[in-house]
A protein has these predicted regions:
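Glycine-rich, basic loop-to-helix element that forms the pyrophosphate-binding segment
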Residues: 63-79
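Conserved donor NDP-sugar-binding/catalytic core segment of glycosyltransferases
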Residues: 98-129
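Acidic donor-binding/catalytic loop of UDP-sugar-dependent glycosyltransferases
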Residues: 43, 91-104
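Membrane-interface aromatic/basic loop that binds lipid-linked glycans or pyrophosphate carriers
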Residues: 271-329
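Short, acidic, metal-binding catalytic loop of nucleotide-sugar glycosyltransferases
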Residues: 21-30
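Conserved nucleotide-sugar donor-binding catalytic segment
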Residues: 142-224
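Short aromatic/hydrophobic "clamp" motif used to bind/position activated sugar donors
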Residues: 84
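A conserved acidic beta->alpha catalytic loop
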Residues: 22, 37-46, 64
Length: 329
């Protein structure tokens, strides 16, 4: 079997049928669908069982609620495919996507991770954004992370993985923003229990994952603890990158601007944490790394320059004030 499609299911009775139909209508059919019902109390269990009776490629696991990571890990343990992909039960994939991405993997059999485009649909309105890629092969995790700005789309879905990658790597149970805490290990940016994987990573412009913003979902209702997971995951990745770059002038110059953009992303999460709690984080590593980078290259990103001028605490207060004034308009 070529592909295992793992779909965690939890209280998505209104969208689950369209999700499954978008897969079952694909021209490529060498796959299994593993539906992991994570203790849903709506009609999802019935829907899962009905699809399983209609098509023997659909397998169902009913379990007690353990969260998204636990559901994915459960599916991985049951997967039989050479490759694994994840689809959320409130999303769909475009017609022809599976045949296109599998054809790409057959053409480049050394590929361990293939990332393909995403159509991001915001709410129920017509607003859409296409996350697209060029045909590029990466054998360096830092290049992939910074040049593709992966930190902005650390999605478990919209990727095809060799199943072997998950022999020693799993999703962290009980934590939201779990993708940010997992993707860096899968791409070899961070060591998992002391060992790095060294995958061949490819991006492609074929196929399309259709993501729908869920107003009741984790991202839309993130708590301080959730955002801290995001901050912590990105901070670990930044520290790993800075450790690998060290004082190598060529690498500092190569990654100068892309590092600043990544640091700005982390700083924005820090500012959000302050807005939620009114508390400053104790000696955030990103502040130190901005200062260190500024000794070697010119800081070009405005927010980082402002950070160096007025300091972290003042920037937190200023950001909160600006947001308060903006919301009054």
């Amino acid at each position: 079997m070529k592909l295992s499609i793992i779909i965690p299911v939890y209280h998505t009775q209104d969208t689950l049928p369209s999700c499954l139909d978008s897969i079952l209508q694909q021209s490529f059919n060498d796959y299994e669908i593993i539906l992991v019902d994570d203790g849903s109390t709506d009609d999802c269990p019935k829907i899962c069982d009905a699809y399983s009776r209609q098509d023997d490629r659909v397998k169902v696991i009913h379990k007690e609620n353990g969260g998204l990571s636990d559901a994915r890990n459960t599916g991985i343990l049951q997967a039989k495919g050479e490759y694994i992909t994840f689809i959320d039960s409130d999303d769909t994939i475009a017609e022809g996507t599976l045949s296109l991405v599998i054809e790409k993997i057959i053409t480049y059999p050394e590929t361990d991770i293939l990332e393909y485009p995403v159509m991001e649909r915001l709410g129920n309105g017509p607003k859409e954004h296409l996350l697209s890629f060029k045909e590029i092969e990466y054998q360096n995790a830092i290049d992939y992370w910074l040049e593709e700005k992966v930190y902005n789309h650390t999605y478990a879905w919209n990727k095809i993985y060799k199943r072997a990658l998950f022999e020693h790597i799993c999703f962290p149970k009980g934590k939201n923003f779990e993708d940010v805490l997992t993707i860096p290990y899968l791409i070899g940016l961070l060591p998992y229990h002391g060992s790095f994987v060294t995958p061949n990573i490819r991006t492609t412009n074929v196929g399309c994952y259709e993501y729908r913003w869920n107003a009741k979902g984790i991202t839309a209702n993130a708590t301080y603890k959730d955002l801290y997971n995001l901050y912590d995951g990105h901070t670990q990745s930044l520290q790993a990158i800075m450790n690998k770059i060290g004082s190598q002038e060529g690498l500092i110059l190569k990654y100068s601007l892309s590092l600043q953009e990544f640091m700005t992303q982390i700083l924005n999460v820090l500012l959000d944490l302050y807005e939620l709690s009114g508390k400053y984080e104790n000696n955030p590593p990103v502040i130190h790394h901005v200062e260190k980078l500024g000794k070697s290259v010119k800081i070009k990103v405005f927010k980082l320059r402002l950070l160096n001028i007025i300091g972290y605490h003042n920037l937190c207060r200023l950001n909160k004030l600006v947001h308060r004034l903006y919301r009054r308009k």
